[in-house]
Amino acid sequence: MRLREMTEDDLPQVLELQRELAFQDWNEKQFLSEIRASYADCIVCEDEGRECGRGKTRCKLLGYAIFHLLGPNSELLSIATRESEQRKGIGSQLLHAGLDKLTDPDDQCFLEVRNSNVKARAFYEKHGFKLYSIRKKYYADGEDAALYRFSRRSPR
């Protein structure tokens, strides 16, 4: 496995990953916008099989993460790992790749997640994110959002 910057060539696999996980929050145009934004950090984790790289077929995308790095207040916009690859540390690697770019002790990273997504909430809490608020009826279907904050000052 290796982490690298997301490129436009990754979009078919990124969109496929969203379909696999049954969430299609973003479309191709939105991903393109993030890849091109100077303040966005778009990371992918890919399988380094024998048949990928150096002009051969593309490596299988295992997961991705998108952060907005906005000085002291960054945001995790999206993170996903193929279902078959979950619980293997890929999500943790992707998350840490973004959080490691927070270098000042006062830097923070924010995120929102569906209140009912217990699995994701446990993942974020395991990595040092603290729940700081609930945003009522945030999503189009009326579900609440759980708002989390990661601070460099608090231990991971």
Model region roles, listed by residue range:
Residues 5-84, 88, 92-102, 151-155:
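Acetyl-CoA-dependent GNAT
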Residues 71-73, 108, 145:
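A generic structural signal for beta-strand entry/edge sites
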Residues 110-114, 125, 130-146:
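Conserved catalytic-core motifs of GNAT/GCN5-like acyltransferases
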Residues 102-112:
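Conserved GNAT acetyl-CoA-binding A-motif
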Residues 1-3:
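Extreme N-terminal starter segment of soluble prokaryotic enzymes
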Residues 13, 122-123:
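Well-formed, non-transmembrane alpha-helical positions, independent of function
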Residues 31, 64, 85, 123, ...:
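Conserved hydrophobic/aromatic "anchor" residues
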Residues 91, 95, 116-120, 137-142:
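Short glycine/proline-centered loop/turn elements that form peptide/ligand docking sites
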